[in-house]
């Protein structure tokens, strides 16, 4: 369909109703469990003086005596490949080389994205 070095315009999306957009999400650095995984916070009062935003218990008992792999904990948030599916194409402006979509496009302003016709539409 395409050859190496061929220029591709937004005209190819003229008859497409929905698209999938892939980009790199904004990096947030090292974040705790409340922001990263939407964990609930602990009591502000009632005897709690130090651990308002900590995870709480992360294991079971003497058996298994360890924390399972994949446990949701604090760590790096964002700066990863994200695909938003089935965004509606509002308008294709060929002369200004613009593709207008309705919805959240992943990544910072001005970052590169990959746009494909929607898989599930």
UniProtKB/Swiss-Prot annotation:
Q: What is this protein's function per UniProt?
A: One of the primary rRNA binding proteins, it binds directly near the 3'-end of the 23S rRNA, where it nucleates assembly of the 50S subunit.
> How is this protein named in the record?
Large ribosomal subunit protein uL3
Give GO terms: molecular function aspect only: rRNA binding; structural constituent of ribosome
User: PANTHER family in the record, alphabetically?
Assistant: 50S RIBOSOMAL PROTEIN L3, LARGE RIBOSOMAL SUBUNIT PROTEIN UL3C
Keywords of this protein's UniProt record, alphabetized? Methylation, Ribonucleoprotein, Ribosomal protein, RNA-binding, rRNA-binding
Name the Gene3D superfamilies on file.
Translation factors
**Modification after translation (UniProt):** Methylated by PrmB.
What is annotated about its quaternary structure and interactions?
Part of the 50S ribosomal subunit. Forms a cluster with proteins L14 and L19.
* Signal peptide per UniProt: none
Gene name of the record? rplC
């Amino acid at each position: 369909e395409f050859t190496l070095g061929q220029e591709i315009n937004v005209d190819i999306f003229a008859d497409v109703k929905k698209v999938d957009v892939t980009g790199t999400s904004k990096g947030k650095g090292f974040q705790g469990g409340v922001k990263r995984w939407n964990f609930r916070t602990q009591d502000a009062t009632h005897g709690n003086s130090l651990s308002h935003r900590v995870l709480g218990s992360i294991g079971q008992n003497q058996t298994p005596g360890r924390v399972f792999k994949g446990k949701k904990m604090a760590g790096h948030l964002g700066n990863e490949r994200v695909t938003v599916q089935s965004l509606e194409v509002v308008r294709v402006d060929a002369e200004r080389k613009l593709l207008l979509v309705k919805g959240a496009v992943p990544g910072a302003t001005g970052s590169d994205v990959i746009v494909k016709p929607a898989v599930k539409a």
